[in-house]
Amino acid sequence: MSNTRHTEISVAYTNSRTKKTYSLDDRVEEITITDNAVGEGDTVDITVMDKDRKMVYDYYPGVDDMVKCTVSLYGMDGGKTGVVGNQTFHIDQFSYNDFASKMTLRGIAVPKNSTFAKTPKTKTWKNTTLNNIAWFTCHDYGLPYYRESGAFNPHIEKVEQSNATDLSFLFNISQTYGNGMKIFSDRLVIFSEEEYEKKAAVRTITHSDITDGSFSARFDLIRQYTGYEYEHDVGDVHWTRSHYFITKPEIKISIGQCESQTDGELKGRAKVNLANRDMQMVTFEIIGDPKMISTATFNLSGYGGLDGKYYINKVTNKFTASNGFTQEIEARKIQQRL
């Protein structure tokens, strides 16, 4: 092993037709792993050389194929400094180019043959909690579920799942109460984005860290909303309540009918925070750093008014045989929460 910074990749491809696992390490030309903080499952695209045409004969993809992909980084002393990826994906499509003898495999973190993400359902949930809804839903698919301690777990008197897939319903109800939801390595996790925003920055990013010409920013100068309004009943009395965290301008969002004052405040805060969350966005490319993952925070320095603490929404990890390992970072400046 050379005593220089370098990257090593491992791609273990399990073929459902042959019931065997093959190493594609020596064939890999490019790997792109997309790491999303919330909403979407992680994905991978792997381009492999196929001069011996094994990918279209011996290794020809089957409907239940899986791939485990890992990018390992090593420092000047030859010691491992970090790992990116290291999760299993379900292959859901491939493309082939005969002229260059290349195949690109696309993998997704969400089980592809499951009705979890594909089949709309209608169901009424009563007298339950977010945690129970998530647990029972995931249990139906044999999908491991974990709720982090900081995530809200409200009591829910009644909620309708109306012609929605279980995946979209869980995501929307999690978001309704200010939580984030992520699927990776066949696990579903509900967590508090606010708690992750409070964590210490993993590093400081300056001009010298960023690939020339890759930095861009979009900043909205006016908040979408500065407060909320909701309605609820106490006995025969109908209440309309509102709350602002910035007095001027008064721009409120209507939450509608809620179960209680507590329910209205939880939903109101979550909706205002979500609407204002992406007011200030940056994107840029850096040399790969295993600490820069979705949900991590970093400090931006040397950009004047853009400086501050940022939360990573999305990381596109890219390895090529010619250029090594790079990352495209999409991040939002952390805003004052209601």
Where are these regions (language model features)?
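Short, compositionally biased
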Residues: T81-Y96, E194-E197, Y311-S322
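Extended boundary segments
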Residues: M1-R27, A151-H155, D233-Q261
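Amphipathic, non-transmembrane alpha-helical segments in extracytoplasmic/periplasmic proteins
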Residues: D45-T47, G107, K121-Y146, Q161-F184, ...
